[in-house]
């Protein structure tokens, strides 16, 4: 497993104390997905060491992403991607409960989510650019739409007798963002209530 960013910094210090160079890494796939062209592995640490080891690392996966010389960068990005993954899993499993409650096909649900994921990935890339720029002017999706949608998800869960923890959390955060005046901004303005 990947350690924390501080664990990586400590490992670099220990390596340097004995004259070694340290690279930190974070595998972004399950074990059975290793060694594939699209297997993503995050790496950080000394660039010269990364360049020397690039060929060996490529055996483990085809998408080796070097994040710079900060030893904790790979662990930090791993925590960020895990935040996304676990949020997506919570949403997916809640959606499976909604699907079950209405007697619909879970296979169809999984197929729909898989088909829409590449487009949603592009949408999230746009949201990252919005946050990075600091310009939350609406260009794709105003936050207010998500306030209404998450409230509806929470209401439907309760009406169906489902556990409503996941949509309740989302509804609370989006409502908080709207109450703070961000409803007419890009969806990514939600980050302002998390800062």
Where are these regions (language model features)?
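Helical "substrate-binding/catalytic lid" subdomain
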Residues: 73-169, 173-194
């Amino acid at each position: 497993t990947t350690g924390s960013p501080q664990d990586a910094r400590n490992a670099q210090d220990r390596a340097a104390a004995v004259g070694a160079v340290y690279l930190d890494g974070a595998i972004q796939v399950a074990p059975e997905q290793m060694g594939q062209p699209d297997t993503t592995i995050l790496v950080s640490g000394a660039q010269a060491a990364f360049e020397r080891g690039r060929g060996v690392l490529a055996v483990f996966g085809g998408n080796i992403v070097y994040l710079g010389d900060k030893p904790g960068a790979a662990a930090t990005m791993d925590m960020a991607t895990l935040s996304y993954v676990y949020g997506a899993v919570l949403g997916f499993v809640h959606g499976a409960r909604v699907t079950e409650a209405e007697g619909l096909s879970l296979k169809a649900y999984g197929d729909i989510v898989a088909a829409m994921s590449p487009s949603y990935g592009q949408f999230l890339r746009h949201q990252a650019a919005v946050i990075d720029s600091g310009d939350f002017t609406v260009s794709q999706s105003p936050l207010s739409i998500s306030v209404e949608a998450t409230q509806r998800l929470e209401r439907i869960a309760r009406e169906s007798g489902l556990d409503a923890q996941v949509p309740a959390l989302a509804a609370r955060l989006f409502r908080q963002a709207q109450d703070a005046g961000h409803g007419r901004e890009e969806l990514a303005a939600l980050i302002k209530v998390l800062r």
